[in-house]
């Protein structure tokens, strides 16, 4: 799970800066596992604090990224627009025998208006200028990937996940991207477990139009629709309610009862109390 080493919750708001954050730690985890003899990986790539297109991960695995003068570049999203060549001569030899399945909750392309930078970088600490620079870097890197590997990842669904990490897995590690929610629901035999249900209540920290791009609520809604079961969402914050209602959600409820800081709202005891109170009110309404 890449978020355990490169996740957004690991940084305070003042530390978040996708120009500097890197997926190097994810590469270190993979390298360690390879050296222990593992050759098959299922990796979850949600919730990252990064927008480096997976460059850091590849650096940890031995790849070197060079500028137009042949100098080795550093780390972070800020180097993307400067990458002119990639040297793979020092990558771990076992990678050629390694299989990667990537659990990916979003379907965003690598770059562009719906890509990694424009959709996700702001919550990772980017301002408007950073977002423009990151997307330009992603576009430049995508062109280099195409000229180097022959693979076109610019518009591939999921390539923009985790700040472009999905694209790196596709382009360089022959990975298979699968919706994380599909893997989860399949493992849980969800379709069988909800048979005969009158109502499904699901939730996440923040629900908005992004929730329709392969995240947990959308996966649950899709299966529930097939069985004619209404779905209600509870979340810490909710936006784009009209779009979400049109998608099929029966109702959307914020669990926050009064103004409070994000830090307070995320405390386990506070969140538990707020969730319980909100769900109790929903059930009371259903029982009318």
Where in the sequence are the language-model features?
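N-terminal loops that bind phosphate or other acidic moieties
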Residues: 1-45, 49-288
